[in-house]
Amino acid sequence: MDNYATRPDEHTVQFVRILPGPIERIWPYLWDGKKRGEWFASGDMPTKPGESFEMHFKHSTLSPYQAPPPEQFIEMDKTGHHSRNVLLAYEPPHRLAFTFGNEKEFYSEVEFRLDQEGDPKDNKVRFTLTHSKIPDRAFAVNVSGGWHAHLAILQDKTEGKVPPAFWDVWRKTEGVYDKRYSI
């Protein structure tokens, strides 16, 4: 298994990571706004499906190391980005799903799943991220590069490592998903 996304269908990308457990240790990184803000986006999340919430993205805060953002993301990185979302599923500590996008665009959907990986004594968690209802290939390429970088940060955080600068990780996949999805 490599760390790249797969495309189960043309409107879905999926990532799998094996993280150090137990599941109860990983769940706060998904649901708790402060912990989620360490690798993805901060913001309090409701517990009742159908309720809306806001997430705040600030990629330069995900690591003590800094790297300049790519030109197309300079303004977003400087000011941060806010997204309005709707909770779709809240099933602690195994499943969390929400809309992804903003009110000016369509909404796609993101699902996080946590499952025991292998023998329980090995204390490993299978984290599956499925991003569905993706409208087109360009959007799939864009979100795949972002998720790839965010998940690398999550992997490091859960392993007790200091992650590299977000934009350095993102740059390593620049162009990779465009090639992978052109097949």
Which role fits each region the language model picked out?
Residues M1-S52:
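Hydrophobic ligand-binding cavity/cleft-lining segments
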Residues T12-V16, S52, G80-H82, R95, ...:
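Intrinsic-disorder/low-complexity, polar/charged segments enriched in Ser/Thr/Lys/Arg/Asp/Glu/Gln
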Residues R17, G43, H82-A89, G101, ...:
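Hydrophobic/aromatic beta-strand elements that line small-molecule binding cavities or substrate pockets
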Residues I23-E24, P46-P49, L88-P93, L114-R126:
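A short, structured loop/turn motif at beta-sheet edges
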Residues I26, R36, F53, L87, ...:
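Hydrophobic pocket/interface hotspot
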Residues M45-T99:
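Glycine-rich portal/gate segments that line the openings of hydrophobic small-molecule binding cavities
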Residues T99-D156:
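Beta-strand/loop substructures that line and gate deep hydrophobic ligand-binding cavities in soluble
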Residues T158-I183:
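Short, highly charged C-terminal tails/helix-capping segments
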